[in-house]
Each structure stands twice: as C-alpha cells, then as structure tokens.
C-alpha cells in the first residue's frame, strides 16, 4: 500500500512539473490573400506547410486539423 501511495505521489509531481514547464510553442494559422487558411493533408509534418510558413517568415510549420500551422508566426505576419 505504501509503495502505491509513493508511486502516486511521484506521478502527480511529474505531471505538475510537466504542466508548469510545458513546451507549448506559440504560433498561428497563416492566411492567404483572401483571408483563408491553407488547407493541407496528410496531418503532421508536411512539406507544403513548411514551404508556406517560410513564405510567411518562419522556419517551421505542420499540418494540424487539416490546416497549416506555423510555429512562432506572429499576428502581424499572418497574412501575405
């Protein structure tokens, strides 16, 4: 019983540490000249999304929810 309690406490502590130091990377969905997002497939790392994100001035992006997502894309650079 004591081992289970200790294990539970350790799991909770690691969960809290992970949520405090989470790796949420800011970003935005880039927009084309018609204010539409760029559609994409397959999900995940996607060469066309990376290319689109580079046009918007950031180094990396990927396909998320069938739309290109650019990491570190600021609001002012969303539309080209």
Curated annotation (Swiss-Prot):
Q: Which UniProt keywords apply?
A: Disulfide bond, Ion channel impairing toxin, Neurotoxin, Potassium channel impairing toxin, Secreted, Signal, Toxin, Voltage-gated potassium channel impairing toxin
- According to the UniProt entry, the coiled-coil residues are none
Its Gene Ontology cellular component terms are: extracellular region
**As annotated in Swiss-Prot or TrEMBL, what is the tissue specificity of this protein?**
Expressed by the venom gland.
Q: Principal place where this protein is found?
A: secreted
User: What's the entry's take on its domains?
Assistant: Has the structural arrangement of an alpha-helix connected to antiparallel beta-sheets by disulfide bonds (CS-alpha/beta).
Q: What does this protein do?
A: Weakly inhibits the vertebrate potassium channel Kv1.1/KCNA1.
By what name is this protein known? Beta-toxin KAaH2
